[in-house]
Amino acid sequence: MYQVGVDIGGTNIAMGLVDETLDVVQRRSMPFEVEGGGERTAEIIYEGVLAMLKEQGAGTADLDSVGVVVPGSIDPAGSVIINAYNLNFHNEPLKAKIKKHFGDIPVFLANDADGAALAELHKGAFVGCRTAVLFTLGTGVGGGLILGGRMFHGGLGNGCELGHALLVSGGEPCTCGNKGCIEAYCSATAIIRDAVRAMEKHPESLLFERTMGKAERMNAKTAIDCAKEGDSAALEVFNNFVDHLGSAVASMINLLDCERVAIGGGVSAAGEFLFEPLRKNVHEKSFFENHGSVVPAVMGNDAGIIGAAMLRRNEE
């Protein structure tokens, strides 16, 4: 039997046919048609699944479930996308629209960051863990929580918004409208903001040279690369970033006594340049002497597909 995993993004719908060993044996990537709404999205998913099954020499009778993850909030019943701004979905009953095509085959719907944590649990950095936390650091900060060996949906079913836990009271403004959120300090966007400020303050810096003093040329990789090369302005930005991320990670360890915290997303590509000082920072701030480890997330681009495919297993 196969599980289908579908990862809906702002530009593409990635889907895969996942076998019992959690290998993705067939893949499809199809454009997301924002103007088509939920009806067209359900059709695209069905068409893609049929194509994958045909390629695999299988049929719908060989399907065990269809799992879908989206970058947005899901209602407690796991049926309606409350808000997914990048998709222009608001109170969208996507599960029911997909189910119309698949009949008796179970369909599951979840947030994409929660799905990524589930993928790490079944095939990645969290294998064997009962309690673990995933931070995904990109334009924003997402995250997922594993409690008792299962994806945590929240007490009221609203999920886990790690990026919007408060880190600095009255601090930097966040996209959510609050101030001082983890996302406002630990995202690629935060690195860019602080690097631009440092560049403008230090025209002699490598940050200034690499961007020709233009804010629009700054990105997180440039800032981190300058820090790796020893630029003092960039190092100050990077060290502040590590300090804030260390506080966020240590807080989760102190709260949950989790076995493992994984860091994913584009910023994690900095490798040991990030993880070595981060582990030291977390150790200094952890209440427990014997605390959980801090590791890179490993699922990469397959996190959405594998996590979506594992949604049924999470409910068993």
Where are these regions (language model features)?
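Short beta-strand segments
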Residues: 7, 67-71, 110, 134-140, ...
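Hydrophobic "anchor" residues
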Residues: 24, 80-81, 151-152
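Short hydrophobic alpha-helix segments
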Residues: 28-30, 85, 155
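A short acidic/small-residue loop/turn micro-motif
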Residues: 31-33, 89, 158-161
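A charged helix-plus-loop insertion that forms the helical arch/lid used to bind
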Residues: 79-90
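Proteins enriched for Cys/Gly/acidic motifs involved in redox and nucleic-acid/cofactor modification
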Residues: 116
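Glycine-rich phosphate-binding loop of actin/hexokinase-like ATP-binding domains
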Residues: 127-185
